[in-house]
Amino acid sequence: MIQVLLVTICLAAFPYQGSSIILESGNVNDYEVIYPRKVTALPKGAVQPKYEDTMQYELKVNGQPVVLHLEKNKGLFSKDYSETHYSPDGRKITTNPSVEDHCYYHGRIENDADSTASISACNGLKGHFKLQGEMYIIEPLELSDSEDHAVFKLENVEKEDEAPKMCGVTQNWESNEPIKKASHLNLNPEHQRYVEIVIVVDHGMFTKYNGDSDKIRQRVHQMVNIMKESYRYMYIDISLAGIEIWSNKDLINVQPAAPNTLKSFGEWRETDLPKRKSHDNAQLLTSIDFNGQTIGIANIGAICDPKPSTRVVQDHSKINLRVALTMTHELSHNLGIHHDTGSCSCSGYSCIMSPVISDEPSKYFSDCSYIQCWNFIMNQKPQCILKKPLRTDTVSTPVSGNELLEARIECDCGSIENPCCYATTCKLRPGSQCAEGMCCDQCRFMKKGTVCRVSLVNKNDDTCTGQSADCPRNVLYG
């Protein structure tokens, strides 16, 4: 019988308040410092996993005790999740690190039906939670040990600049039909759709974070964790298929004109990424300051299209919640959702698809967004999001700690008897093109057009490319 592990964090008797502090999230006015102390209640003889499936924390916020319930976001990563970076001489280096025992959670506050939470427990607690209608940020204090945390309202973070931030999509949605309530859609798990995304980080981002790939990786993971929560009630399941960091140089011309960058990124994605990575949608995360007030742009209704199923987003805030909701906004354009108008409403201060990004962003879609998204899905029938993500790359690449592997690994070197792969060097044997994969047969790529995965919903079976051992997910019938 599987027993749920209960973890309680008790606070020291005297948490204190401060008036101003500089944190990773920015300059903060009015914050509390709390001192978590972990108390674990385990069955006798049980071994504590590094990151439990379910956790519970007791916190004091504004002097009042609250209980935070957390559950690991098990669907955060695709099973063939990969990470790619580039060596100084331009070599592409790809690894498949294990992400099953990750540290990213969703949750709620006890006795608060409207509460939400997205938390990283990798190094202390970092993330946000909604309590009694207010959004709070929690993060470890970097200048002390991991038990010291700051808790503060999002509204208490000083603005990084006064200029309003806008989406670059200018196409407006107009309809003479009255907006129905989202509940009239009768959405249920049978409507579930699945979107596998790849996040590409440009060279400016790599420089902005001082070449720290671990920091970039964790930031992307935290933001996709937030995205996944936002789409939950839309019955759209988001998973991260991979991260690519342009650590050597940009592979496209990243420029302040957002539409031009979007066009270039789409062209690169079409000719490069699908050949080596199964995914439904790709995003460029950039440090560049786009012209005007734009912080993101995307193609409307382009999901599953091999070229325009893309979006570009500026890393415009130190607070990952704000950038994550911009990423959600732009992906929603790909899913056929337009900007909200005055007749649209949600349960937040503002809605995700507002054309102007609020300083207090909402994690809620409007009634209009629900209708537009599912009208698009039902009418346009994008095929790539019908299939629940499956493992398409069975290679388990060894990694050292959290570092990206610095040597090229061509095959799974787990078996000495593998006729395609040298066990000692993880290199393919002479004459071998592959060692494993749905499009690999006797160490050779299967011919182009060979069916590798039969479609259960239409006649668009997935076929081999003749250039890879992977069975690519069909993206040509959106």
UniProtKB/Swiss-Prot annotation:
GO terms for biological process: collagen catabolic process; proteolysis. Residues 397-478 form the Disintegrin domain. Its cofactor is Zn(2+). Keywords: Cell adhesion impairing toxin, Collagen degradation, Disulfide bond, Hemorrhagic toxin, Hemostasis impairing toxin, Hydrolase, Metal-binding, Metalloprotease, Protease, Secreted, Signal, Toxin, Zinc, Zymogen. It comes from the Eukaryota. Residues 193-389 form the Peptidase M12B domain. InterPro entries: Disintegrin_CS (IPR018358), Disintegrin_dom (IPR001762), Disintegrin_dom_sf (IPR036436), MetalloPept_cat_dom_sf (IPR024079), Peptidase_M12B (IPR001590), Peptidase_M12B_N (IPR002870), Reprolysin_adamalysin (IPR034027). Disulfide bonds join C304-C384, C344-C368, C346-C351, C411-C420, C413-C421, C426-C440, C434-C464, C439-C443, C452-C471. Binds 1 zinc ion per subunit. Residues 1-20 form the signal peptide. Zn(2+) binds at H329, H333, H339. Its EC number is 3.4.24.-. Pfam families: Disintegrin (PF00200), Pep_M12B_propep (PF01562), Reprolysin (PF01421). The active site is at E330. One of its GO terms (cellular component) is extracellular region. One of its GO terms (molecular function) is toxin activity. Residues 21-187, 390-408, 474-478 form a propeptide. PANTHER family: ADAM A DISINTEGRIN AND METALLOPROTEASE DOMAIN, DISINTEGRIN AND METALLOPROTEINASE DOMAIN-CONTAINING PROTEIN 28. Belongs to the venom metalloproteinase (M12B) family. P-II subfamily. P-IIa sub-subfamily. The disintegrin belongs to the medium disintegrin subfamily. This is Zinc metalloproteinase/disintegrin. It comes from Crotalus durissus collilineatus.
